[in-house]
UniProtKB/Swiss-Prot annotation:
UniProt protein name: GTPase Der
Keyword Nucleotide-binding appears in the UniProt entry: yes
Cross-referenced InterPro entries: G_ENGA, GTP-bd, GTPase_Der, KH_dom-like, KH_dom-like_a/b, P-loop_NTPase, Small_GTP-bd
Family annotation (PANTHER family): GTPASE DER (PTHR43834:SF6)
Gene3D superfamilies for this protein: 3.30.300.20, P-loop containing nucleotide triphosphate hydrolases (3.40.50.300)
Species for this entry: Campylobacter jejuni subsp. jejuni serotype O:6 (strain 81116 / NCTC 11828)
Residue span, KH-like domain: 369-453
Residues that bind GTP 2: 202-209, 249-253, 313-316
Protein's gene: der
Alphabetized HAMAP family for the sequence: GTPase_Der
Example of a GO biological process term: ribosome biogenesis
Length: 460
């Protein structure tokens, strides 16, 4: 697997970018210079490709400990495939940064200069001063505000080759292709259509227990204004339109620095609950507003490939505009959950809570949907006719056929002549066409490309 290393002096935002790209809080971040001294690493996916992301310690000659960190960082950089060098956009370029950057450039690897903390027009003007580093690829970011990352991801994706699949999915897909006969309908795994498992997640005190109580119409969990009252997961079931909906009320997730004892255990339980859920209700506090921790929790939901409904609780106390809020969530904070419906409720008064029950049934139906192979291929043919596949260095790229090979979540295989040539933007176009035609609201849609008649995912 290819690796991407984040390098830069202390406090330029490496750990924040690492957390943003990993969609979870792994590295400790603060405004104190040099908070991260050890090398952190985690597997990530950028669009349809996977990579190992490495967060190095800060480069600084002023401290004996940091001299050792710098030595180790340069060693790891030599072993990495792609280098992202971060600088602070609120400060003028200095000779030390240039020296570090030029030493990395000599390694002959793909390298980009990432100017972080570009939060306003004044910062944008100052960022141009970094052009004298003599590098073609410069990206202005505001990691805190999630601005500028799309361009960086698109550049990174060009250098990544290994396709991302859900853990254990590679073996499942290859086994499917080995036994599948083209043109025939596939027998899917059995999914109990009458029992739906729903996990309720969110940070502390957003009203998850109140929501559960409103859904089941009884006081099952202890409800209190004290943060973190609910520690143990609590299961309750309701019957709605002849379907059993089992709810799990999870302990609230705090910022990691505040997690102690039972709450640390509860955080681990939350992960386990998500792994056994089919649909997640991601509860947000519409009165207090949203923060970075909400995004981390949303990342946990995305990581488990669940159906999802975003619940704006305490809406009766909110002064937000609903349409603007939905746009902010889908286009900014939760781009990776842009398919999730957003529903406003007031758990305490019970207002609009009933809407959730119908929506859960609808999302579950989408989550377990089976697409007829002939209809899927008709759609793919029409889509490629309307917008032909781009050539790969002058060579024709062709999709022979498409087939759904799994459900819950739905997974589709594209059998091609040159699967690695399928750009993420074209795959996203196909995803949008499939979503529009077959209604996959609220569920992730996995698309994998494979070479015809081979387990290889590219031409030999």
């Amino acid at each position: 697997m290819q690796s991407i290393i984040l390098i830069g002096k202390p406090n330029v935002g490496k750990s924040s970018l690492f957390n943003r790209m990993a969609r979870q809080r792994i590295a400790i971040t603060s405004d104190i210079s040099g908070t991260t001294r050890d090398t952190n690493k985690t597997q990530i996916h950028i669009h349809s490709k996977k990579a190992m992301l490495i967060d190095s310690g800060g480069l600084d000659e002023s401290d004996e400990l940091f001299k050792n960190v710098k030595k180790n960082t340069l060693k790891v950089a030599k072993e990495s495939d792609i280098i992202l060098y971060l600088v602070d956009g609120k400060l003028a370029p200095d000779d030390e940064d240039r020296q570090f950057f030029y030493s990395l450039k000599k390694l002959g690897k793909p390298i980009a200069l990432v100017v972080n903390k570009v939060d306003n027009k004044k910062d944008e003007e100052r960022a141009w001063e970094f052009a004298n580093f003599g590098v073609k690829e410069i990206f202005n970011l505001s990691v805190t505000h999630n601005v500028g990352l799309d361009e960086l991801y698109e550049w990174l994706e060009k250098f990544l080759h290994e396709e991302f699949l859900i853990p254990d999915e590679e073996e499942n897909l290859e086994d499917f292709l080995e036994h599948y006969e083209e043109g025939k309908e596939f027998q899917f795994k059995e999914v109990d259509q009458n029992h739906i498992r729903v996990g309720i997640v969110g940070r502390v005190n957003v009203g998850k227990s109140s929501l559960l109580n409103a859904l089941v119409k009884q006081e099952r969990s202890v409800v209190s204004s004290i943060a973190g009252t609910t520690i143990d997961p609590v299961n309750e079931s309701v019957v709605h339109k002849d379907k059993v909906i089992e709810f799990v009320d999870t302990a609230g997730i705090r910022k990691r620095g505040k997690i102690q004892g039972l709450e640390r255990f509860a955080l681990n339980r939350t992960e386990k609950i998500l792994s056994h859920s089919q649909i997640a209700l991601l509860v947000l506090d519409a009165h207090e507003g949203f923060n970075e921790l909400d995004e981390r929790i949303a990342g946990l939901v995305a990581k488990h490939y669940l159906g999802v409904i975003i619940v704006l609780n305490k809406w009766d106390k909110s002064e937000m505009d609903f349409d603007k809020t939905v746009k902010e969530l889908h286009l900014d904070r939760f781009k990776f959950l842009a398919y999730a419906p957003v529903i406003s409720v007031s758990a305490l008064s019970g207002k609009r809570v009933h809407v959730l029950l119908d929506k859960i049934l609808q999302i579950f139906e989408n989550f377990t949907q089976k697409i007829q192979t002939s209809k899927l291929n008709t759609l793919i043919e029409n889509a490629t006719r309307s917008h032909p596949l781009p050539h790969d260095y002058g060579k024709l790229v062709k999709i022979y056929y498409a087939v759904q090979y799994d459900l819950a979540p739905p997974k589709i295989a594209l059998i091609m002549n040159r699967p690695k040539a399928l750009h993420f933007s074209y795959k996203r176009y196909l995803q949008n066409q499939i979503r529009k035609e077959f209604n996959f609201e609220g569920v992730p849609l996995v698309i994998a490309s494979r070479k015809k008649g081979s387990k290889e995912n590219d031409e030999s």
